[in-house]
């Protein structure tokens, strides 16, 4: 990593997060422009990305984003499904940036007639290859571009490159999470000696089918709980009650006076005064 302030360098925990998310595993093909970010090439053909340079570019990109006067002038785009949840969380956490998750509407930066027209001052992408339409239109109107780039990504019109594995959902999520955290640190919202209370898992892609199954399972469990009458919710009065207290009545009192073994004065076997069989 280039010389600079030690406070801006990655910690051991940051490097471990990047390694666990497989941010360093690049594609097998490598362009000439991206070769300077490659640490080495493995025997299986995978290019290993230098994580120190990755974190250095994350800090540089965060400094550019923090320099924009209003977060609403920053536009985050992800045509790739793995990055759509990440950009939505990123835009929310940095204070209201404009996200475009999914298909980019052609002419959104150049055609002033349509409703989707936007004039951002900065563009942040997940993949310049997938979001090529946004890259081309941004070049027409001179919008600076920051992009997550794999070693096989085209760098034309891209101003700041964040070298990483942008094809893995965990790698994309952790890079966007670190970018948002660094922006908050540079703004002074988050102290550098404090842990961010937002977990990286919040930025990871989740399969809609998996979410649907979890919701159905939770609904079924709640329905079964309602049918049986079983509940785990107890109020404070019931929990604080003294269940060992004795009652106020005298349940051990002696029986009433009298000879219970004496014979009765009447003849219970006597026949009735009239014939019942008539």
UniProtKB/Swiss-Prot annotation:
This is Small ribosomal subunit protein uS2. Its main location: cytoplasm. Component of the small ribosomal subunit. Mature ribosomes consist of a small (40S) and a large (60S) subunit. The 40S subunit contains about 33 different proteins and 1 molecule of RNA (18S). The 60S subunit contains about 49 different proteins and 3 molecules of RNA (25S, 5.8S and 5S). Interacts with ribosomal protein S21. Gene3D superfamilies: Glucose-6-phosphate isomerase like protein, domain 1. HAMAP family: Ribosomal_S2_euk. Residues 216-235, 250-278 are annotated as: Disordered. GO terms for biological process: cytoplasmic translation; ribosomal small subunit assembly. Belongs to the universal ribosomal protein uS2 family. It is found in: Cytoplasm. GO terms for molecular function: structural constituent of ribosome. Pfam families: 40S_SA_C, Ribosomal_S2. The keyword Flavoprotein does not apply. Required for the assembly and/or stability of the 40S ribosomal subunit. Required for the processing of the 20S rRNA-precursor to mature 18S rRNA in a late step of the maturation of 40S ribosomal subunits. Keywords: Cytoplasm, Ribonucleoprotein, Ribosomal protein. GO terms for cellular component: cytosolic small ribosomal subunit. Residues 256-278 have a biased composition (Low complexity).
């Amino acid at each position: 990593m280039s010389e600079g302030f030690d406070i801006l360098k990655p910690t051991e925990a940051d490097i471990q997060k990047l390694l666990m998310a497989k941010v360093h595993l690049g594609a097998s093909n490598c362009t000439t422009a991206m070769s300077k970010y490659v640490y080495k090439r493995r025997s299986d053909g995978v290019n290993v990305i230098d994580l120190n340079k990755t974190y250095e570019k994350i800090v540089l990109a965060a400094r550019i984003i923090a320099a924009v006067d209003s977060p609403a002038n920053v536009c985050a785009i992800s045509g790739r499904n793995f990055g759509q949840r990440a950009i939505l969380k990123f835009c929310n956490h940095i204070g209201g940036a404009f996200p475009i998750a999914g298909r980019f509407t052609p002419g959104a930066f150049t055609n002033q007639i349509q409703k989707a027209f936007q004039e951002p001052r900065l563009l942040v992408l997940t993949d310049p290859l997938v979001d090529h339409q946004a890259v081309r239109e941004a070049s027409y109107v001179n919008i600076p571009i920051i992009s997550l780039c794999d070693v096989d990504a085209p760098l034309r019109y891209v101003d700041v490159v964040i070298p990483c594995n942008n094809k893995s959902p965990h790698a994309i999520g952790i890079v966007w999470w670190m970018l948002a955290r660094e922006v908050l640190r540079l703004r002074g919202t988050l102290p550098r000696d404090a842990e961010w209370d937002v977990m990286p898992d919040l930025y990871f892609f989740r399969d809609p089918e998996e979410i649907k199954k979890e919701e159905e399972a939770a609904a079924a469990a709640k329905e079964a709980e309602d049918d049986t009458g079983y509940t785990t919710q107890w109020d404070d009065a019931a929990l604080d009650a003294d269940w060992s207290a004795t009652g106020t009545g005298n349940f051990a009192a002696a029986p009433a006076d009298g000879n219970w073994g004496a014979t009765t004065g009447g003849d219970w076997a006597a026949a009735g005064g009239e014939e019942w069989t008539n």
